[in-house]
Structure formats: C-alpha cells, structure tokens
Amino acid sequence: MQNVHCIVMTRNDDLIIEHWVKKHINVFDKISVVDGSDGDFTQKVCEKYGILYTKDPEPTPEKPFHEQYLREAAFNLLKPYLTPGDWVGCFMPDEWVYHDPREIVDMVPGAFHDVIAWNQLNILPHPSEKEEYFKSIEEGTYNPTEVFKHFWHRDNNKTCCEPRMFRYLGDEIWTHQIPWCDNPVAGRIQPLNRDNIAKIKPTYFHYKVFDLDPTKYKDDGFGHFDK
C-alpha cells in the first residue's frame, strides 16, 4: 500500500477541526496543517494529536497571500516525510473523505497519472435537522457530521470534481505570481506541474455550513432551517 499524506488549510474552524482530525488521523500517514485562525485552538488540537503545524506565512512581495502560497507552506512541513511516489491530499476541515484514499491510490494504474480528482457532495442544514441541532448545542455534543446528512445542489449541478490529490515526485512547482487578480492559478489546488488526472473519481463530503451563526453565513447558514 502506498503512503498517503494530507495538507490541511484552515481558519477559525474550531467547531469542526478536532472532529476532522479524529476521523482522518488513521487515514493519512502524515497530516500537515497551515492555520490562519485568530486563536490557538487549532494549534492545541494539532499538538494533542501530533499533527504538523504552522501558522499562515507572512506574505512578501515575492510570495503574496493566496491558496497556493498557503498550501506550499503546509507541503514544506511534509517534505522530510515524503518519498517519491507518495500521494498528498489537499483538504479543509469541512471536507471529509468518504472513500479511503489509501485504497483509491492503489487503483491508479501505472505512474503516468499524477492527480486524482474527487467528487464533491455538498451537505447543508435541513429543516428536519433543526431540533437535533439545537439539542446538540445545548448538550455540548455538537458534531456537524452527525447532525447534517442532506445533500444539496445548485442550478441542477449536483456535484463537481476537483483535483484534491497529487503524486509527490520532488519537483513540485507552486505559483508565486502577483497580485491575485492577475494570477489565474492562485486558487489552483495542486502544484502547477501536476495535470495528468486519473479516471477514478472518489467522493468526499463537504459540510459547507457547519457554523450556523447567521452573521457568518446568512441565507447559506441558519436560513436553511426555514426553507
């Protein structure tokens, strides 16, 4: 079985980050977190579970602040533990794998394919879950992945596939172009030199709204209970 690691980009995800770690710590061989949170909750979770951790790097004129720069920071923490041929996943705390990535990478034929795109299923609050949500909040047992179970889609596009895993070869290139508005690849998930996507399409759940504070999500949050 091939080694599979994960880099996680997070910011103020206190309600879900420890749940994510508990779920995935035995799924990935090594996990590296880049954190832009205001407090130290995520840092303490990473220390508790032995997760590699770094704060968001400070942007510079040569390396501006965007997703490629952040993922590169987490990737650099992983490099001492990587062997050519390993796979690296790119997820966030509200993205939970349904299929086991260790089994998925073994299904990729040969060495030509260096990217695996994952099928995203969005999960949002449903009126039928309102009572359970309030109960879990009151009891201090809230876990969004146990409360919310309804898939959601927009404009008849029920799902989408995104390149969420790449094969480590040691020659990874991340963009440092500036500024964001002139950088068409700043939001790209995988390194610039990884484009050969395998045909297999595993699935992950995207708990798109796990914090129902209406000041944060408005209609995409608490409002779902009224729809």
Each PLM stretch: what is its role?
Residues 64-72, 76, 82, 98-227:
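Catalytic-site signature of metal-activated, phosphate-bearing donor transferases
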Residues 22-30:
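Short, acidic, metal-binding catalytic loop of nucleotide-sugar glycosyltransferases
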